[in-house]
Amino acid sequence: MFHADRIIVAFDGSENSKKALLTAIDLAKTVNAAITVAHSHDMKDNQTVIDPPRPAAEASYISGGMTSVPDPLISDVTSPEPMIYEDRTEEVIAEARMMLNEQQADGDIDILEGDPAESIIEHANRISADMIVTGSRDQNRLKKLIFGSVSEKLSAKSDIPVLIVK
C-alpha cells in the first residue's frame, strides 16, 4: 500500500492543475498525508519586450524630410508593472485556498520563484515530500517541442515520484 506523509501539488490555476489538486486532496485524505500547494512563477516568463510609444514629434521628423528618427531615451522604455503579476499570483493562491476549503482539507500554500519544474523539485526536497502531483498541460506540438512541459520536466528530473493528472 502507498504511504505518504506529505504531498506537494504544482498549482497554476489552470483546469488541469485544479484536477491535480482535487486528486491530491483525495489521495492525502486516503493516506492521511499533509498537502502543500506550490505556485511557482518565473519572472522571466512575465517580462515582455514592449515597443515603446514614439513621441508625437516623430511625425514631423518624417514629414520634414529627415530619414532617421532619433532613438527614444532609455528612460522612455517602460517595463511591465510587477503589480500585474502579483495580482495574478494572489488570484491563483485564492483559488487554491478556496478549493482546499471546499474540500474541507488543510494545506500549506507556498509561492516559489524561478523555473517552475526546478523550483517545485527543490521545494519538494526541502519539505521532504513523498510525492509531487501535477496536471498535464495541453500545449500545441510546437510549443511543447520548444519549451517542454512542466509535468514532463518534473517526471524527468525528480527523484520523488510524480503523479501526472489528466
Curated annotation (Swiss-Prot):
Pfam families: Usp (PF00582). It comes from the Bacteria. Keywords: Stress response. PANTHER family: STRESS RESPONSE PROTEIN NHAX, UNIVERSAL STRESS PROTEIN UP12. It comes from Bacillus subtilis (strain 168). The keyword Zinc does not apply. Belongs to the universal stress protein A family. SUPFAM superfamilies: Adenine nucleotide alpha hydrolases-like. Induction: By phosphate starvation, via the alternative sigma factor sigma-B. This is Stress response protein NhaX.
